[in-house]
C-alpha cells in the first residue's frame, strides 16, 4: 500500500497540473500560431491519457490475489498500461510529424513570441517537476519473486504468505497468516484441497476474495524454500514498466517545452517583421505583392523585406527532431511490453543452454515440452516435462533441477515428472504422458505421430514433441527420407466367413 500510495499521489498531482496546462497551451497556440506550442499541447493531452491509464493500471495491479476468473490476478495490468502508453506516444509522434511537414510547405510567422516564451517557460517548469517525481522510474530494477511447484503441485502467487520453518522432513505445515518470526521463510501458498490452481482458499460467499481467517496448508515436497530478505524490498519491474511509460511522456513533454522556448527566443531576436504603416514583402513564401515591387521602387518608396527565412523553418525542424527523440526512447518500451504480452522467451534466458544443463543433471533422461515466458517484470515462469529413471530418486533430481532454473533467473517452475516404463527408450518415446489424438492440434506445438507395425498388440500412444525439442532432434540426427516421414497406416485383415475383408485405421 505504501508504494501504491506514493505512486498514486504523484500521478494525481501530475495529472492535475498537466490538464490545466494543456488547456492553457491550446488557447495560446491558437492565438499566436505557434506549431511548437500546439504540438506540445497535443503532447499534454497524450500525457493526460497516459496518466489516467497509469492510474487505472496501478490500481488493478494491486489485486495480486488469485480468483476463479483470473488465476494470476491483475499482475499484467501494468504491462498493458505501458503498451497503451507507448502506442499513444507513437501515434502522437506521427501526428506531429504530419503537422511539421505541412509547416515546411507553408511556413507561418509566429505572433506574440514573448507570450509563447512565457508559456513555454512555465511548461518547462511543470515538466521538470514531473521529471523529479518520476526520475527513479527511468530505468528498471531487478526483482525476484520465487515460487515453485513440482510434481502435482500448482503455482502460487509470486508473493505468498510468510510461513514458519518446521523440522526437516515435515511435509504438512499449518501456519496462520499473521505469524511472523526471526527465522521466517517465504514461499508460495500451495493448497492441495482446493480447486484454485494458485492455492488460495476462496470464500464461498465471494469467490473473488480469498478467506483471510483460515489457516493455510503448505506442502512443498517436504521442504520450505528459503528466500533472501531483500526480495520484499525490491519494487516489481512490472510497475517500473508502467511508470516508465509515464516518465517517457513527461520527458517528451519537457523536450517540447524546450523547443517552444528555443523557438520563441530565436524568433524574437532574429526575425525582422513588418511594422504597421510600412510596405513590407515577405520573401519566404509566395506573395502577390512581389509583382509590384519594381513599380513601387520607381516611385522611390521604401520597401522592407521580412526575414531571415530560416527562422520560419526552425519551428518544424525542431519538431521533427523531437519526434525522432521520442520514437527512439519509446521503441524499447513498446517492444518490451509487446513481447511480454506475446509470452516470448525473455531475452536474458538462453533456452538452449538451459536445456543442455537440464539434460546434464544426473538422473534426467529426457527434457521436452519446455516453455519459458515472462508473466510481468522479472517474474519468469517455466514448465517442462522431465523424464527420470527411478521414482525413488526424483526428489533429489527435482532439487537439482530447481537449482538450475534458479541459476537462470527462473523462480516459478512447474515440473511434470515422467518415469521411463519397462522397455521404453527415450529416443523413441520422449513423452510417457502423451496427449490424446483428438487434442493434438490444441497443444502448444502440435504433435508428431509415432509409426508402429501391425505386430504390436497394444496401441502406441501419440508422441508429443515440443517445437524446440523437434528442432534439436533434427540438428543432431540425419535427415530422414520423404518416405520415412510419412506416418505408417496399419490395415488389419480379418478372415470372416462369407464377409469381405474389413480394414481399420
UniProtKB/Swiss-Prot annotation:
Glycosylation, residue list: 297
Cellular component, GO, one term: cytoplasmic vesicle membrane
Q: Which loops or segments lie on the Extracellular side of the membrane, by the record? A: 32-35, 102-113, 268-306
Q: Which InterPro entries match?
A: Cation_efflux (IPR002524), Cation_efflux_CTD_sf (IPR036837), Cation_efflux_TMD_sf (IPR027469)
Transmembrane residue ranges: 11-31, 36-56, 81-101, 114-134, 247-267, 307-327
* Residues engaged in binding Zn(2+): 43, 47, 249, 253
- What is catalysed by this protein? Zn(2+)(in) + 2 H(+)(out) = Zn(2+)(out) + 2 H(+)(in)
Locate the region Disordered: 142-215
* Alphabetical list of Pfam families matching this protein: Cation_efflux (PF01545)
Q: Where is it localised?
A: Cell membrane; Basolateral cell membrane; Cytoplasmic vesicle membrane; Cytoplasm
Species for this entry: Macaca fascicularis
Protein name (record) = Proton-coupled zinc antiporter SLC30A1
Does the UniProt entry include the keyword Nucleus? yes
Phosphoserine found at: 504
GO function terms (MF aspect):
calcium channel inhibitor activity; metal ion binding; zinc:proton antiporter activity
Q: What does this protein do?
A: Zinc ion:proton antiporter that could function at the plasma membrane mediating zinc efflux from cells against its electrochemical gradient protecting them from intracellular zinc accumulation and toxicity. Alternatively, could prevent the transport to the plasma membrane of CACNB2, the L-type calcium channels regulatory subunit, through a yet to be defined mechanism. By modulating the expression of these channels at the plasma membrane, could prevent calcium and zinc influx into cells. By the same mechanism, could also prevent L-type calcium channels-mediated heavy metal influx into cells.
Give the residue range of the signal peptide: none
Compositional bias of kind Polar residues: 187-199
| Topology in the lipid bilayer | Multi-pass membrane protein
Q: Which residue stretches are annotated as topological domain Cytoplasmic? A: 1-10, 57-80, 135-246, 328-505
Subunit structure comment from the entry: Homodimer. Interacts with TMEM163. Interacts and forms a complex with TMC6 and TMC8; the interaction regulates zinc transport into the ER.
Annotated disulfide bonds: none
Q: What is the lineage of its organism?
A: Eukaryota, Metazoa, Chordata, Craniata, Vertebrata
